[in-house]
Amino acid sequence: MLLALKKIGGRYRRFRDTVRQRILPKLRCTHDPLKLRVADFKKSDTLYVLASGGSINDLPPQAWDDIRRCDSLGINFWLYHEHVPTWFSCEVSRTPADAATLMQVLEKRLPDYANTAFLLKDIHKLDERYPQWNSEFPLSQIRHFYALHSLSVKGRTVAALRRALRWDRALGGFKKSEELWALPMKRATVFLAMSFGLMAGYKRIVLCGVDLSNSAYFYDHPRYREARGLPEAPTLPSSAEALEQRYASEGVKMLKMPDPTIHNTIDPALNPLPMDEIIHAFHDEVLRPEGVELFVALPSSRLFPRIPALYAAV
């Protein structure tokens, strides 16, 4: 255990030094971007996690009333949607074209997001993933900028993951805190969002657009980019052969031919541990024992019925 803590400490120090030396000089904010004070932004006990699944377009008016009344956290290309969340988290894609699109959309939406807290993970990987970040990433324009360290959760099988989650929880890895500097992470940003919801003290987390049942996105509808003159959103190839070629060009290791009809986080070609099982494990081993309720917005999510739905589709 002591060795593991030393490793975490060493990684964080390298992360902290990178942020202070390379990121902090570009910021105009007066706060420390390595320490997030939750109370500065949190105004509700419910957190709506806003992902990009196509079911976002099926949410009923009651859901939007609740989302506007409570806190929300937008993920990655949520920027295409008109709703401005309390929190926003993104990571820079390994695909240069996708990274460039994210930067373009981010810059256009920054005036709308003036009061939103940005939680940026893997910020120390900008040199690798987006070399031109030094001149093109609008860091200085982000008023509430925070760089959070990602703590990797171990486990390559469901059983191993559940053991790791129980162990991490016992060691205080998911402890609630008024000031956050790091968040546990497993594969996808939605896990980080749930970790954040728990550690920031939310009592209820609602997953919106976490469909996992198909490869559709809400921003596939042209109205989202046309309304604000945004660039076309990135898409994955629709054929297995083209998708395989795309992944290979990015250095992604595949166990077999990928399936373009399903969400990439549940594709066994990419990882034998699907994202839905990761979410269920986190719910069972961490959220429920900590007294945090987890819901999906709509029953069309692959997570339903093991995780209950709050609304019916319009």
Kindly label every feature range from the protein language model.
Residues 2-314:
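Metal-ion/cofactor- or nucleotide/acyl-coenzyme-handling active-site neighborhoods
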